[in-house]
C-alpha cells in the first residue's frame, strides 16, 4: 500500500495505491503556512472519510520545500512509515540538460510515468498544466531531454484580473466561438482558445526539432483542452502519481 504525494505550487495531489491500482485520490490546497499537525489532521480525516487502510510506504514529489517538510513529518507521525522525497537519482533517468539539478521533481516523475505508455517512435512529449505549464521531451528507455515552461492558464487568468481595472475573474470554460460578443466570451476565447493554440504550437515545434512523439497531457486543465488540442494522444490526470508508483516499484 503506497501513499503517493505530488506537492505543487497551487494544489497537492495524494493517491493511495493497492498494488498497481489507484484506490483513492484526493486533492488539497497547497498552503505554505500549514504546520505538520494541520497536515496530520487533514490526512487523518481524508483516510477516515473513505475508510482507507494506512499506507505501508510513502513517496513524495515536491516543488515546495516548506510544504514538503511539513507533509513528510505529518505522514511519518500519523502512519509510522518513512516518507521518502524523490530525488533525480531515484528516477533512473539520464537527465540530459545543462544542469540536471534544475529539473523539477514533478517533471522527472512525469517522464517516468510517460515511459509506461507504448510509443511507436520511443519519444514522448509530456504537457503538464499547473501553476506553470511544462512541456517535456522524453526518449525511451530512460532519457529526459529537456523542455519548456509557460505560464499556467489559471495563473494567466488571475494575473489579468489582478492587473486590469475592468476585466473580471472567469472560469476557464471553452467559449461558443473564437469571436466573442461580450467581455466574458472574449476573455474565454483569448484564455482558453489562445492557450490551446499555444499548446498546439509548442507541440508542433517540439516535433519539428525532435521528430514524432506520443503526446501525453496531464494536470487539471488537460480535460478541458482535450477537444481543442487534437495533438493530445493521451490524457492522464494521474500521470505524476503513477510515475511515483513506478519509481517505488523500481521501474524508473
Curated annotation (Swiss-Prot):
It is found in: Cytoplasm. GO terms for cellular component: cytoplasm. ATP binds at residues 6-13, 131. K(+) binds at residue 128. Keywords: ATP-binding, Coenzyme A biosynthesis, Cytoplasm, Kinase, Metal-binding, Nucleotide-binding, Potassium, Transferase. The keyword Transferase applies. Its cofactor is NH4(+); K(+). GO terms for molecular function: ATP binding; metal ion binding; pantothenate kinase activity. SUPFAM superfamilies: Actin-like ATPase domain. It comes from the Bacteria. One of its GO terms (biological process) is coenzyme A biosynthetic process. CDD domains: ASKHA_NBD_PanK-III. The active site is at residue 106. Pfam families: Pan_kinase. A monovalent cation. Ammonium or potassium. Substrate binds at residues 104-107, 183. Its main location: cytoplasm. The keyword ATP-binding applies. HAMAP family: Pantothen_kinase_3. Homodimer. Belongs to the type III pantothenate kinase family. This is Type III pantothenate kinase. It comes from Thermus thermophilus (strain ATCC 27634 / DSM 579 / HB8). The gene is coaX.
Amino acid at each position: 500500500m503506497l501513499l503517493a504525494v505530488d506537492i505543487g505550487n497551487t494544489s497537492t495531489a495524494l493517491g493511495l495505491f493497492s498494488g498497481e491500482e489507484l484506490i483513492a485520490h484526493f486533492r488539497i490546497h497547497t498552503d505554505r503556512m500549514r504546520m505538520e499537525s494541520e497536515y496530520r489532521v487533514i490526512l487523518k480525516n481524508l483516510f477516515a472519510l473513505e475508510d482507507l487502510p494506512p499506507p505501508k510506504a510513502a513517496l513524495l514529489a515536491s516543488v515546495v520545500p516548506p510544504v514538503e517538510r511539513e507533509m513528510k513529518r505529518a505522514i511519518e507521525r500519523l502512519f509510522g512509515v518513512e516518507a521518502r522525497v524523490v530525488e533525480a537519482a531515484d528516477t533512473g533517468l539520464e537527465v540530459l540538460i545543462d544542469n540536471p539539478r534544475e529539473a523539477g521533481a514533478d517533471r522527472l516523475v512525469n517522464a517516468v510515468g510517460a515511459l509506461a505508455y507504448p510509443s511507436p517512435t520511443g519519444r514522448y512529449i509530456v504537457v503538464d498544466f499547473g501553476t506553470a505549464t511544462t512541456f517535456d521531451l522524453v526518449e525511451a528507455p530512460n532519457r529526459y531531454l529537456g523542455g519548456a515552461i509557460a505560464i499556467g492558464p489559471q495563473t494567466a487568468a488571475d494575473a489579468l484580473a489582478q492587473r486590469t481595472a475592468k476585466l473580471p475573474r472567469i472560469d476557464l470554460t471553452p467559449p461558443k466561438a473564437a469571436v466573442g460578443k461580450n467581455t466574458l466570451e472574449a476573455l474565454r476565447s483569448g484564455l482558453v482558445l489562445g492557450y490551446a493554440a499555444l499548446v498546439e504550437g509548442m507541440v508542433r515545434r517540439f516535433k519539428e526539432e525532435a521528430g514524432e512523439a506520443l503526446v501525453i497531457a496531464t494536470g487539471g486543465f488537460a480535460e478541458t483542452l482535450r477537444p481543442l488540442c487534437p495533438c493530445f494522444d493521451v490524457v492522464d490526470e494521474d500521470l505524476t502519481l503513477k510515475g511515483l508508483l513506478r519509481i517505488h516499484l523500481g521501474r524508473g
